[in-house]
């Protein structure tokens, strides 16, 4: 990342002798379409996730133990059967989501993610909006001031996200228990959706730049650490598609929650294959 403008010499694009161009950009293509699509995608997820987190209903289907990821782990005293494994330590107040201890960390993990940072820097703060498009502001401070300096905490939120992914995996495993299945085992479309969501959450988390640094960072000689080197190469392969996984997981989270909401509300029955 380039240095703040206050530390740059008056040369290059900052040279006083550089030609002054009145137009913000000379690009003739629809460069604004990509930022617009990203803004709409972010807005759709934020609105949906916020509405569902505060709806406080249709988040758990006890017959098949389906629990939406937006309410996991469910720690409120109003969670009922959804928190059999977890202590109900949160008060039942309307302004506090049932998963209030995990949602902030997941939000901060995504907000500080390298891809998401680059995305909303362009679309929300327009810094820059697009290649060869001038920024609307004159001064650039980078990630040296509050609140952007908080971006450096991403490496710590990575560990919390890993713990929450373990919890989501537990939820997906428990959902294979059915009250009607042979030996208590059941398998339906909801299980498929939950497992796919968990797999994609793991792929997104493990493809994180912080994970790449954890596995291979600070190694001066890879040949002396063949296991870590192999893990680093695999994480690096995943890392090349981190942007794709970031968007896929937003979709799988919404799909999983929406499907469980429909089943829990009685709008549709779960398509069962076994039990």
List the predicted regions and their residue ranges:
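Membrane-embedded alpha-helical bundles that constitute the cytochrome b-like, heme-associated redox core
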Residues: 1-275
């Amino acid at each position: 990342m380039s240095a703040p403008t206050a530390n740059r010499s008056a040369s290059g694009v900052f040279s006083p002798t550089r030609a002054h161009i009145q137009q913000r950009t000379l690009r003739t293509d629809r460069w604004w379409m990509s930022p617009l699509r990203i803004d709409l995608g972010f807005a759709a997820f934020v609105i949906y996730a916020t509405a569902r987190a505060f709806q406080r209903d249709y988040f758990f289907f006890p017959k098949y133990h389906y629990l939406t990821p937006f309410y996991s782990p469910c720690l409120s005293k109003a969670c009922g059967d959804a928190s059999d494994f977890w202590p109900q330590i949160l008060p039942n107040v309307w302004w506090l989501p049932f998963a209030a201890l995990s949602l902030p960390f997941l939000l901060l993990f995504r907000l500080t993610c390298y891809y998401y940072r680059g995305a909303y820097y362009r679309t929300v703060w327009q810094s820059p909006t697009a290649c060869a498009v001038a920024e609307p502001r004159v001064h650039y401070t980078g990630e040296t001031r509050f609140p952007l300096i908080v971006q450096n905490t991403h490496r710590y939120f990575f560990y919390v996200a890993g713990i929450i992914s373990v919890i989501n995996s537990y939820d997906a495993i428990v959902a294979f228990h059915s009250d009607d299945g042979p030996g208590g085992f059941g398998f339906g479309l909801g299980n498929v959706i939950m497992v796919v969501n968990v797999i994609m959450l793991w792929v997104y988390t493990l493809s994180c730049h912080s994970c790449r640094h954890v596995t291979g960072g600070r190694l001066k000689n890879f040949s002396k650490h063949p296991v870590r080197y192999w893990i680093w190469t695999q994480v690096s392969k995943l890392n090349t598609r981190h942007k794709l996984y970031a968007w896929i997981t937003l979709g799988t989270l919404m799909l999983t929650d929406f499907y469980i909401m429909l089943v829990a509300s009685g709008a549709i029955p779960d398509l069962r294959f076994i039990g």
